[in-house]
Amino acid sequence: MATFKDIINYFRPDWRLSVVSIAASSIYEIVDLLVPYAIGQILNVLSNQPLDRPLQSAIASIGELINYPVNQTLSLGVLLGLIFLVTVVKAPTQPWLTSWFHWDIALRARRDKTQTTIAKVLTLPLEFYDENNPGRISGRVARGLANHTWTYPEIAGQLIPKLVRVLGIFVFILLIEWRIAILYLISFVVILSFTLKTLRRIIWHESRLDKYMENTESRTSELITNIKTVKAFATEANELKRQQQRLDREFTVVDYRIHKGYVKLLTWQKAIIQFCVFTILGLTLAATVDGRISLGHFVMTLTLSSMAYAELEPISNLAEVFARRYSSMLRFHEFLQEPIGSDSVGLLAAENQTASPYKFTGKIELSHVSFGYDDSRQVLQDINLLIEPYQTVALVGRSGSGKSTLVKLLLRYFAPQEGEILIDGQDIRTLDVGKYRRRLAIVHQEVDVFNGTVLDNLTYGRPNATLEQVKEACRIARVDEVMEHLPQGYYTVVGERGVRLSGGQRQRLGIARALLVEPDVLIFDEATSSLDYESERAIQLAMRSIQGTCTTIVIAHRLSTIREADKIVVLDQGRIAEVGSHDELLGHQGIYRRLHSLQETGELLN
């Protein structure tokens, strides 16, 4: 569970620079207090009242140093010089020693945490993405990074220095008249306590609002992704109404919970502040009349107390802004604390990218493999299967029989709960997952295409491939036929998710991309199930060209695509029901023969 400590640790790498920059900002705030102090002492000089003893000693030392008599002129000159140093000389240095470093720290942290976030995205287990909407994830990450970036300069550069300034004013007033200082302290304790109590309620409401916003962003992301379906069913008005209801719910939380609470806070603050200012005025005036403090101290006390109370509103504003962001920052850290997939350990290590690659013959053996996504149901049960090198093996069966799950185990997306999977006699769990996966390639039913050029997508798994190697892979996958119809050939931008390509073109691109990495094991996961006849025929020819060049595993619903497979494995309810060639299985009165009859004639055999 994320805590406030996680927000602090966000900036931990630059903690030394943070301490220096916060200290510098705080010192500048304290130094600013010398101006009202000096003005008060000038009034004492002009009204012939004594200066404070430390100041008298300092002026006397300066007089001795420059050989000038201590008089009104010297005193005024020293005080004016002090004001000049604080106001004029300090001004050009302050932005560089404060704002520059605060933003530098914030931007450095954003860069580092963005990299950490991307690493987290790349290493989270697949089930996380099955359970969480991409829009929800991206919204949480974007808000978390932005809020951290904006919050640090506000807290380190404004809130903390302002609190130090208020404390410094208390010390100044305490040295002048302790009774006034006690009232000042009590008033600030009361105001800050009430502020913190109110902000705790605001933070609770903000956590609700943050979840509502994630739901809205999630639905918006879905609308963009599925806009064709929305338009096809003419449900624009319904979707707009649903989003309006979500936005109204957010507005209710903001307006009647958060904003109303903050307005109440400001109302009480202003009432207490004005009462305290009036009370301090009366006490200071009484102390001056009684002769306990000088005229200069009277002016300085009123000026400093007014400055202190004037800081309360920006302090409250900053605290309120932090409270508004607090929930989203915690939810960002909750995302970072999500456990990475067991298959992702070491994937991002630099040595993993440069280590010597594996090389397999492609012999795969599954021995007593069982697996379930939860304890309630086993998806695969006691699977025993031997795939020889360079064989083409087809996996068929009804939907939900475990075909795709078996492939996920082979790719090490998940680990079998019982049994083992061997490749060339080695348990795949003992192999480096990155080096292992680079010897496998898969072509999905829906090929993932990035928003770039055709060449970028083709070389995704092998960026250093030559153009000749790319063209050879495209020839085998029949992508060269597609190139003739693209305006810029290999350099044509395919658009988000490959929207400028047809389904068949994306499939061919996926096959060429897989071939380019020269895998030892090539997997087709229902690669032709949603294609038209012409595209399916082209994919079949490409698959036929690949046969015998590597171990090939084909998941197929259309049995016409696997007639020439060396071995067909029929799965039923998570178990292997039949194994054999196309002709052998047709000779049995089994599941394969019934499925084949249904696809060929539309009639299901008994």
List each language-model region with its residue ranges.
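Alpha-helical segments in transporter systems
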Residues: 16-41, 79, 83, 102, ...
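Transmembrane helix-loop-helix hairpins at lipid-water interfaces of multipass membrane proteins
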Residues: 19-93, 174-179, 291-295
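Hydrophobic alpha-helical segments in the permease module
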Residues: 83-94, 188-192, 265-282, 295-317
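Juxtamembrane helix-loop junctions of ABC transporter transmembrane domains
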Residues: 31-40, 44, 79, 84-134, ...
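Cytosolic ends of transmembrane helices, especially the final helix of ABC transmembrane type-1 domains
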Residues: 231-235, 308-338
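ABC-type nucleotide-binding domain
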Residues: 352-606
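Transmembrane helices of ABC transporter permease
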Residues: 18-29, 89, 157-209, 282-293, ...
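An intracellular "coupling" helix at the cytosolic face of ABC transporter transmembrane type-1 domains
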Residues: 126, 143-152, 156, 164, ...
